Each structure stands twice: as structure tokens, then as C-alpha cells.
């Protein structure tokens, strides 16, 4: 028999429906973050020193720093990181930032300057390590721990540096004329705009300031008028020929022109072309071939053209005419009078070549470089008088000084590509050639040649990831520091100082802290489930510093662009104001060194698709024709069809197969991770797919995770890359397992310097950022062999290494008494009782005892005026026990605060004298459970300031922690001993001893039996004659001692950290954190959703017996409204239902076969069925070669339902679903007869029924529902606050007032607006009246009315209220009169 495979049952086996083979490996999903930050920090210094990027580049750009006189200089040598003080977990617990100290080696050089010659000689060199603050480190999962919370730095999309050509789309001028503009955007520095106005004059702007003629800029670059014209225009020479003139003929110049007068050969005088004809390119070429050299021109032809050069009288130096002057009769006469026989004019025909630059030169008032520089200076620094030096220095610093202006390598590359230049990418400033090339290109565009740029093309937008954002931020900090250093170098006695004395690292550290703490791009990580983590790390935002703002971003920026294909997901983006501004990276995309997003393609060579994969950016892709991944191929890899659908330069077209040179690697390369998790995505409407991918990120991890029957094959990738499921770091054998850790004895890559033991600590019931529960469960048993990369533990929302966001539930599509009207969801009570959608949420409560002015607060069980019943859950230190069940209002931590002394009444004095009671000096400020939350205390942490005595509880927690550490150390020591002594025994077994322990005969043979007579620690005393072996023994002993020492040192260090006091905010003496776990069952009002954007709210939970049921008595779990499908066009859910039904049917069939096996011990029927389900191909498990145990294990895994994978755009089709339904023995319609649970009658029509994967979303009714009777009021308006967080009340708003007005309910309305709302005096009066038993009251003036009056007064309107009641009563005449 062929080689047998065994199945360990630790992974979910899926039947793959995909037909397209996976050619490229999907890149690690959080590579974007990790690679970027690693490249920035470069923690390990490579052997040849670090390259100039990241942190190294920042230091290199700021150092060396010279003082103002040049007498000393501070140089940067290198930097290095020390080990972080606390590891990730300790930082999380103690609210610290996970970071490593940065040490920089600086060299201070002091010069002697010769006063006469000014020559420098080195007088002194000092080198020193300087501490430069802490640098946050990234965790293995691509996040940062800042002040104890996990944060993510989102990558930013921004406009790439370089040059962009654009026009105003005809919006500026009323005629709709296109005004072209060019903009040079550097990475940092001044922007340069060059633009046309409506009169076709070219202007330049620097930093969006007042515009200057572009020729002013060119003159400032050192050109004069003649240079400028000769750069932009060719010349035509008119030569005097008797009375007429002749001009040279060139085919290029004349082609396409309409001839106004006859074209006459100047040499022969014959007419070569009559007037009124058009000279085509072909006929123009023919004339040149026939030998036409020059043609006749008249004076009329000269009029209106422009001189190409100055006309000068060389004898006197007088300039008669200047270059660019228009030729008219007067000018021509002057020319003829000076005896000129040749006139050079500019080649401007106003059709193909416009005279824009010449016209600009004519408008420009500046004549010389100095005037031009002064003009620019006045624009940039208005109000300052310019001098030549200051103007020149300012102009140079704008574009030509590397300190102030940086195009960056990207900018230079883009500029070279756009303008066909060939500058090195180390030239990061502008050159004269660049500016000229930009103006030339702009004029070409105006003349109708060339294309404008599309700024939404991904070739013109780039991604700034963590590393680069951090680099910019750190540079800002260093530049602030540089100023301080320069000042200090000048003011201090430089000979006596060390580099340490010059440097104050605070600005650099502050810049880093500010970036991680308050930057728009540093975000609190969305940790609801593993998918939301991964999506957050792969997010691209166009917002943030230097980016767009929501209000200003138009439709174009938000829209999907053809270049997004395979780079940015067209589906996943938020609904609402941020739509299209926040995107997600596609599954296979990666970011290249220039920050452009690349997508992988397979090469097509000679019509054959190869497996070579190339990554291309949007700019490079535009040159190729790219076929889609699902194009049909024959077995040799050639295209089957003559014409293939492909993409070329943003257009989709049919191309002959010979022209195709690339092909997509995978159909899912165009969508993001979340969208790739939706099966049958191809059958869903885009809007619903968007909701589906967004709602998966809100799914709450359930108590019992279950992977979907109908998956897409991406589930395992997400679980692994997100770090939720734990993968083995190297191969080995499981040594110990319990709920909190897995110990693996390594058998692969055993490095002598590393321990031979891997200990994996599992997270137990930890709180996530979103209060969901993070809990990991081991999947392995003692003795299991482990391969590198195997999943050894499941995390939150993972099931056997597959992402499991929800549960498979049996759904019937039918209306049920209006309970599923408008997307409501009807649930069965069974779902609640079986805890199908039960989740655990962990709330954190924190209480701090501070040192107040009146004395310290105290955490204690001794609280005034509180019954013993209320203290039942507290220990002697006043802190709640672990495991206590707590209800709203229960005390979690008892705390008393000293009260200020108030003057005592005589009675109080008497009582105080009698009882000597001092208890009234404190008030109860205990931490209590907030309203509406019930739960169980799962963890308590106590933090003490240094030097504050620890209470009992803190000591107990500390002891527990130290015991855990000791156990870890002992286990690792035991495995080390086993490993080392085992190797030692193998090495000396059967060898002749040259020496041994006491009582051992020298020269006898060492055997294992003999060795067991001595304690293991004495085995090292055996020695052998073989020198090589003896050397190995000694090396092993050295290694063993070293490992032992390292273990002990690590243990002592951890213990010291546990015993040491904690860093506390100022004024805090002691802090207690209590974690309460809340079990949330599903209930009416909770939001649920499928993966296809089909969301709804639970409306009612029905008793099981009332739910519709099948013939065999199976009740539906959920009833959904069929009307939710047609208008939403998310048919994917129906296909999923049918396929899920087939999966469950197959599972049931396998369950029956397992029963057969148990009775008959014949496994063949089971094996045959499984082989039929998982046919042999490269994507399925090799079930054919499984041994019997593996077959049984697999069968047990799939008996609830066979798991399948239907990848997006390459999934199961109708025929596949039909085939699977048939195999399971079910109707291919996918419908069944259902019976009403209440009456037992069958329903009239058959009902679609099947399994859908449903999620419970993080919009739970418990978090939203809220009640208040009395609570806080707003200070100003005296109205209740709003919202659950503020414990707010209801507001009788504007519309409600209208309702009462409409009813004319005047008294009710008066009550609402006064005593029931914010009439303070009235409120108290009503209370008093009720106490008296009186039911009359009088309304006063509401506080909000007073606010209105005050606001009007603040506007300067004096509003006074006159009480006119008495006067009116007097004025009324008596009725009797």
C-alpha cells in the first residue's frame, strides 16, 4: 500500500470546491506593519553597519551638529537598544508602554582655529553613549502597548511626491477654457505651482502665494530673455533674396498645414502647391524627396513673427531690437536699414506651437536676475527690504537646499519617469533642468500634446506605514533638539564638557510620546475578534496629518479606481462620512520600498502561463495586458480561447492570446481579508457585501466557537496570522499541558545557546479592548509529536485553527406571525438553553486611593454605616473575593475618604464626648457595581506605590505569582536535566572510564546500570581517554551550567519585578483593579447577522415546541423573512443555506456509518464515503492514504456537518450544490415540508431550510438599555444629562412639545416645561407639597429660559421682564358699570 498519512484531529479538514490552483503563497497578513517598523528600528546591527534608512537616516540627516562659530562639532557614531525593562504582559498589567531604551554613541570634536589663517586642527575628541529616551517596540502581532492599552498605527495613503499635471476642467473661466497647471510636490519643503491663466500667460506660485510670471523664476535661475526663448523655441531663418525672402523647407514643420498662398520653390521659382490645399504628412515628405530645399516668402509672411535674438550695433553696443519683439513694418525697416540679410525668427505658428512663453516674457517687468530674485523675495517675505545676498540665500533655500527641501527617492523616481530625465535618485533637491522640463511639458500640454495625470491612480498615491510615520515624527523631535544643542555649545565652556552635557533628549522622547498618544493615525485597536484585529492592522486611511479631511474629500477620491484591482479592496470600506477614505489592503497586496502597493501576477511566456510570480505596482502594470485568474487553460498552461478578456491601462478588453503577458495569481487577490471570508461573494450585491465584511468585524467571540460548514478556505490563514490561535515555533514533543500553558520539548533546530524547551503561556479570560473575552484552549495532549507551524491552542473565535466568528444554525425562510417583519429574527428557546449564542464579556473596574489634602484615602473593609450583609463579598483588606457573584450596587472595593471638619452642633459635641466616636470624619467612597451589570469576579490586581506597606491581599497575589514562576523554572530545569543527562548517558555508555566518582574502578566499562547507582550530579566525574569525546563532554557540561545559570537569573529578575513597588501616577498610593466577567445570553433586542449583509434584531424567543419542524421532528433554530432576500440581492445566503443543508446531510450519513462500524468493525464503507467526499486533488486532504484511526477521527470530526471551502469567485456552482444534495440523499430543490409547531399542521408550501452561519454582533441590548429615576443634572441648564454613560435621563424634546401644543394640552405642557424639567424652585416646592399631602403647585421660570436671556444679554440685547399683572387688573373696568 502507498505511504500512509495519519491525521491528528487538530485541524479542520475542508472539501475544496476551488478549481484554480494556488500558485503564489499569500503574504503574511500583518507583514505590512511588522516589516515597516523593523526596517525603521533595525534593532540588530548588520555586520557591515546599518544602511541609510529608518532611524539611522534620521540621525545621519540631523548630525553632525556644529556650533555657530565652527569651533566644535557633535557627530553621530551609532545607536543601539538595551533589553526592554518589562515584557508585553507586564506592560499590559502595569499600564506601561512596551519600549526599549535607545542609546546613541556621540563623538564631540573640538577644533583649534588659527586666528590668522582660519585653518582648523583637531584639539580634542570625546566619545560617549547618551541615553535618548525609550523607543516603543512592536509586539509579535504588529501592535504597540502604550500606557497599558494595545494600539495600532494605521497606514496612511497620501499623494506621492513628484510632479503632477492637471487642468481645472474648465471651471475657472466662464468660457470653459481648460487652464493647465503643473505642481511639483516634495516630500518636505515648498510646493511649486506653474499654471496658465485665461490669457495664456504662464505663471509660477511658490507655496500657494501670489503668482509671478514663470519667466521671473527662470531668470532667477540665471537665464536671460534670449536663453529662455532659445530653450523653448526653434528658430527659422529668413534670408534676403532680392525683393523677397526665402526660408528653408522642412517636412516636419509644414505637414498638416493649410496653404494660404502658393508654395513657390525659391531656387526654380515653380509653384509646388497651390493656395487653399492642405499639405498632408505624405505629400510634405514627397516634396522633400523631390529636392525642395527652400521656399519663397514675402514680407507679409514676416509680419507677426517674433525675433529670436537681440539686434545689436556691435560698433556702439547699442541694442536696436530685443529678442521676442514682434516684427511689424517699422521693425522690418529698422532691420533692413541695419543691413541685415538674415533674420532669425521664433518658430511659432499659433497652431501647433503657441507663443505662451514669449508672451509671458513680454508681460514680465523684470529684466535681470537681481530684479527677479528681489521680486520672489518680496512675495515670500513681504515687508522686508531685499538685499542681493538675502534674496539669493532665500531663493536657494527654497528648492536647492537639502536641509529644507527633500523630494525623497520616490519623488525623484516619479519625476524622472514623468519628465524623461535621468537624475540619480540620490539627487533629492530640484535642479534647473527639472524646472525647465516641467515648464516645457506644461506648454506641450497646452499645445495639445500629452496627457494629464490622474491623481486617484495608485501610481500617484503611496502608503506611509508605521516606520515612515515614526521616522518623520522622530526627525521633528531631533530638529527641536538640534536648536537647543547649538545654543548650549555656544554658551558653555566646550573644552570641559562631554556629549552627555550637551544633550537633552526630552524633545525627541516627547515627539515619540505625542505621536503614539495623540496622533490621528495611532488608534485604539479594534479587538472584538481576531478578524477585526487583522483588518485594523491592514487598514489604509486617507485622513490624518498631511492627508485629506472628510469635509473636503470629493467623490473622485472616494471612488473605486481601476488601479485598485488587486491592491485595495473595492468592497470593504465604512458606510457613512468616511466611505472610500478608509480602505483595506487586498489579500495578496504588499507595499514596496517606495511605498506603492504591488500586486502579484503570473508571467505568460510565449502564450504559456508559467508559475513565476512577479509583483508590480500600478505604474508598471499599465504597460502590460493582464488576463484574469479564472481564464480557461489547457493542460500545458496555454489559453484555450483565441481571444482572452484582459485589462490594459485601466480598460477591459478582448485581446488575442498572443498579446497577453501577465495573468492574475488568484481570484481572491482583488478583495480584502474580510471580503474573502464571505462564501458566494460573487452572488451578492456589492452594497450588501460591504455590510457583510464590516459586520464580521463586529462579531462577538462566543463561549463555544464553531467553524462554518460553508467556508472559503481563508479561515485558517486569518486565525494563524492574527495570532489568536497559537502555532508551534519549532518541532518537538508535548511534555506537559494544562489550561494555562503548554510545555514542548524541542527536537528541531536545537541551538546550544537557546533552551531546549518552549513554554507557551495561554491567555485565560483576559479582557480585550472591546471588553470581549480572550481565552485560549490547548488542543494537544502529552506525548503528541508536533511539527513547526502546527496549531497547538485555539484562541477566541477559533475552532481547530479555523476562524469561527459565529455558529451554524438551522434556518427556515418563512414569515411567522409578523415576528420577522422588517428583518426581525425569530429564535428558538433551544438556542438560549444550549448557550449557542452566549458570550462572555469582561468589565474592568479600577479604584485608586489617593493622598488628599485632608489625609490619605484608605482601602478597607471598615466602612461607616454599611451593613455586614453589604460587606459579605469582601476580604479583610476590603477587596472582593475572586469568584464572588456581584449585582448592581454591590461593593467591589471598600474605600473611605477623610471628610473636612464641619462645625458641630452642641448635640453632636455631647455624643462625641460620650462615645468618643471619630467615625464621622470619613465618608464612604467605595467602588460599587454600576446599575444593570451582573457578573462574577474573575481577577483582582493590587498595585502599591514604592515604600507603601502591602496589605494581605497584595501579599497573597504576590505569593501566587512567585509560585507560578518557580513552577515554570522547575519544569524547564527538569526538561533540561532530562535532555542533557540523556545525551551524557548516550555519549559515555559502553566507554572505558579514565576516572569516575568515588568508589568507581578506573579502567572499567561504564554502563547505564552502573550509572544509576550514582546520583546524576556525580555523572560529570566520569572521564574517558578519548580526547575528542572528553572535549565534547566538557563542552556539554559548560553548556548545561550556562543554561542553568541563565534560568536562575531569569527567575530572580522576574521575582524582583513582582516584589518591587509599582510606578503610580502622582498622588496615588494604591490602586486596585477588579475584573468582572458577565455572561450574556442572546435576548430580544440583540443584533444578529449573516455573512452576506443580512442583519436583523431578535424580536422574540419562542418555546421549542412552537417552532416549525421537519418530518423527522427536527425544529428550526431560526426563522428569517424571505422578503429580506429579493430586494437586497444577496442571493449568496440562499446558496449558503442549500450547501449548509447538504453538509449537514452528509454529516448525518457519516454519523450512521460510524454506528455501523461500531457494530461490525468494518471501516471500509466509512473510508469509501470519505474518499468520495474528499476526491484526490492538490487542495484536499489525502484521505485515500489515511490509516484506520485517522479515518475514524476524521469521521467523528465531520459527523455534525462536513466542512467545505468555496473560495470567492472560484466557488461551488449550482451543479456542485445539486450533486452534494443528491449525495446526502436530500431533495435538489433544497426545500422541505415544514409543520407548524403550534397546530402540527403542515404548511401549504414547501419551505427553504438549511444551515446558515449566523453571527451575534457587538450591539447588545444590555449595553444600550438603561433606566434612571434620579441622577445628575447639567450645571447650566439644570436638565438631566443624556446617554447611558452619563446615567442620563429622557428629554421631552422639540417635537414632543409640538405634539402637546397640537392637542392644546396647556397645563400638561406647562408641567413638562417647568416643574417636571428645569424649574429648580418649582421642583423643590412640588416635592414639599407631595410630602405634605397637598396636590397643588405653582410653576416658576425654567432655568433654560434664564440661560436664553443671559445669551441674549451677551449679544448686547437688554432683555428685561416686567411684571405687569397688577396694572392690568386695575385697568379692567367693572362689569356692573
From Swiss-Prot:
GO terms for molecular function: DNA binding; DNA-directed RNA polymerase activity; ribonucleoside binding. InterPro entries: DNA-dir_RNA_pol_bsu_ext_1_sf, DNA-dir_RNA_pol_bsu_external_1, DNA-dir_RNA_pol_su2, DNA-dir_RNAP_su2_dom, DNA-dir_RNAP_su2_hyb_sf, RNA_pol_bsu_bac, RNA_pol_bsu_CS, RNA_pol_bsu_protrusion. It comes from the Bacteria. The keyword Transcription applies. DNA-dependent RNA polymerase catalyzes the transcription of DNA into RNA using the four ribonucleoside triphosphates as substrates. The RNAP catalytic core consists of 2 alpha, 1 beta, 1 beta' and 1 omega subunit. When a sigma factor is associated with the core the holoenzyme is formed, which can initiate transcription. Belongs to the RNA polymerase beta chain family. This is DNA-directed RNA polymerase subunit beta. It comes from Brucella anthropi (strain ATCC 49188 / DSM 6882 / CCUG 24695 / JCM 21032 / LMG 3331 / NBRC 15819 / NCTC 12168 / Alc 37) (Ochrobactrum anthropi). The gene is rpoB.
